[in-house]
Amino acid sequence: MKMLPLRAAIAAALLSVAVGVAAKPLVVCTEASPEGFDMVQYTTAVTADAVAETIFNRLADFKPGTTEVIPALADSWDISEDGLSYTFHLRKGVKFHTTDYFKPTRDMNADDVVWSFQRQLDPNHPWHKLSSVGFPYFESMGFKELLKSVEKVDDNTVKFTLTRREAPFLADIAMAFSSIYSAEYADQLLKANKAGDLNNKPVGTGPFVFQRYNKDAQVRFKANPDYFRGKPPADALILAIATDNNVRLQKLKANECQVALYPKPDDIPSIKKDEKLKVDEMNAMTVSYIAMNTSHKYMSDVRVRKAIDIAFDKAAYVNALFGKGNATVAVNPYPDTLLGYNHKLTNPPRDLDKARALLKEAGVPEGTTFTLFTRNGGGPTNPNPMLGAQMMQADLAKVGIKIDIRVMEWGEMLKRAKNGEHDMVSAGWAGDNGDPDNFLTPMLSCEAAKNGENYARWCNEKFQTLIDEARAKVNPTERAALYEQAQEVFNQDQPWISMAHTRMFTAMRNNVEGYHISPLTTNNFATTQVK
């Protein structure tokens, strides 16, 4: 007669233990809203964190905290001797998310891989014209010209045939624009005349399943119980959007979030002194820059661009925004840790008299006004956008140039910059794959000028030829020599003011474990948990 109460007591005890060790939700304070959830339509790191790193996977991936390419949805691959064919062998048993709006009937297979690339490659594909903005990253990277075909060999094998050798191809395949979608889900949406849901109700194979998005407030996910690398330790992931880095820090201290992305560099010492907090940091592959719209009056003249460059005090800018040791003044469009960095190039000295002379020679009337677009909140490449804009405004006033500062929400700024509405725009880039091509082709190529990702609207044939040749070279020494020449052309023609290469910081509560800061500035929380 005592057995039933004993069993009940044991059951209650087990339930108590289970409740006690239940995984806690992870709340991450992030700096901006994602542009959308159809990853291939967008290019920003904010969107990649909220979409590519949570919802989707790719054939290959980067080992956490490094730029080493490792298997992901493909568990192996073969490369032909001529370097023109890549055959990917897919991992078996990978499942797409089951949601209230999609119930997959099969595992991920070659049809999904082919669909994901053909949609971007083939103008006759039924989904190709449904993207209102095209496929900016795919196009800027030159993949339209690079990919000859993407073919299904069998259910678990896909063959990519290239038109030329491409040294960074495997690294490119690990990037956000190469995310793999469910062809079955896409077919379901097309038949139901709900194509827009691909961008609003995403489905992938990634560590987290999308639940809902409250614009400019938060994105909510739940852990994927079927994730091929194992269910994430956090039962839920919440991205809490706070554009002000001071607000993100306040929320972290109040335990309203357990991770705060991109704190201000000058807040780092006080964060490190707080017993309840800790900081992860490393040198990042970034560049912050001012792009000058070479399609606009006056800005099309290299003398004007040179004048603006030598009138602006970049050293003062870096010191004011980043503090000592947290960033270096940039010379070239990518940092010196990457292949082919040209160490022979230097910044010209600041020279207001020469700047005035160049402006006069170019016929720019004193008092001419240029617009400068900047964002309303700080991020990894620009922790204090308004201060930086005001410093430029003050410096250029000394040479007779007025700056009309236009502060706007991140997504709005990108949209208007892509449309070419700016004279200048304060922007930044974080390398996606550890290769110099990832800085030069997406932001400075002629193709990127056409689709608006090249905010300078700069298309230089000599520069284009050099970076095209470099991509096709396998020998690192030969590639490096070509990149050094490309940087010389860039500096001679001055489409940007290269501002800074930064150090990356992430602040978190002491009870957060399993987070890996990345030199690529991506944030993946598949292994992160709150203890």
Language-model features: locations:
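Aromatic- and charge-enriched surface segment that lines or borders ligand/interaction sites
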Residues: D75-W127, K159, K251, Y298
